[in-house]
Amino acid sequence: MTCADHPAPDPDTPLLADSLRASGYAVDVQDWRDSSVDWSGARVTVLRSPWDYVDHLDEFLAWAARTSKQSELWNPLAIVRWNTHKSYLLDLAARGAPIVPTVVLLGGSAASLDRICDAQGWNAVVVKPAVASGGQGARRAGVGDPDAQGHLDELLARGDVLVQQFVPAVEDEGEWSVVLVDGQVGHALRKQPAPGDYRVQHEWGGRTELATPSTGLSELATRVFALLPAPALYARIDVVPIGGQWHVMELEATEPSLWLDLAPATTRLLVDAIGARLSPRTG
């Protein structure tokens, strides 16, 4: 399942769809907002790139609830509801996962960025919407930045907001991402920002390369995957180093880019995992 209303193509879906077809499965790629689609005709519905859900969250959650009654939804509804609002980070922390220090602010509330920084002991932060993807609406800010306070006020007028401690290592070392399938590490990626930026997404000039995760990183990713609120088909866990230890910055289990073109073995893992959910074979 994908979306039609997005300027950038999703390179993962064609690779996965072709690999499933080559393994003997019937595959249709559909836009979740297409009301003519009969989702009950699918034994399994795999969420891949519904990237426009951030602009239609209530509609998307209603679609997921309906579809989960008609088809086997992966990832399941409980994960979709949990993962589409970044407050899931606080839940992960409560379950024992190390996260980048985060404060969640409710939409419509009034908050002082300087007071938050003072209370937390932070010199710099990243302010971002609680419902967003691809770095949308994110802004780095330092203490005493009046423009950043205005940005926070604008975001709060629209909805809930995350304020996260800025991790300086991102500028030099970038982020690491670990892609897991059924709890098994498929591959890892190192994502680095463009010079002078902190955002690692390609929309902002970032670059991504396949990398070998350390044993500690793989173990952390596996442990965090097990903390999801329901069994999951896949997830991408984004981490950064703080004080020599990995901390979760985000966890994507609804619409993550997986860079399957860099990791054909992970594509095979996904095909096998989806196949295990399909009985008997179709097509």
Task: Give the ranges of each region predicted by the language model.
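Short, basic and Ser/Thr-rich N-terminal targeting/leader segments
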Residues: S23, G134, D172-G174, L233-A235
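Anionic group-transfer/hydrolysis microenvironments
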Residues: P50, A130, F166-V167, V179, ...
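Active-site nucleotide/adenylate-binding loops and adjacent lid/helix of ATP-dependent enzymes
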Residues: A64-K69, L77-E173, T215-S218
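Short secondary-structure junctions
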Residues: Y25, A97-P98, G121, L228-L233
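A short beta-strand motif that forms the metal-chelation/ATP-contact edge
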Residues: A42-L47, S177-L180, Q245-S257
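Conserved N-proximal alpha/beta basic substrate-recognition cap immediately N-terminal to
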Residues: A4-L106
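Phosphate-binding site of ATP-dependent enzymes
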Residues: Q136, R140-P229, V240, H247
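ATP-dependent carboxylate activation and anion-phosphoryl transfer catalytic cores
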Residues: T215-G283
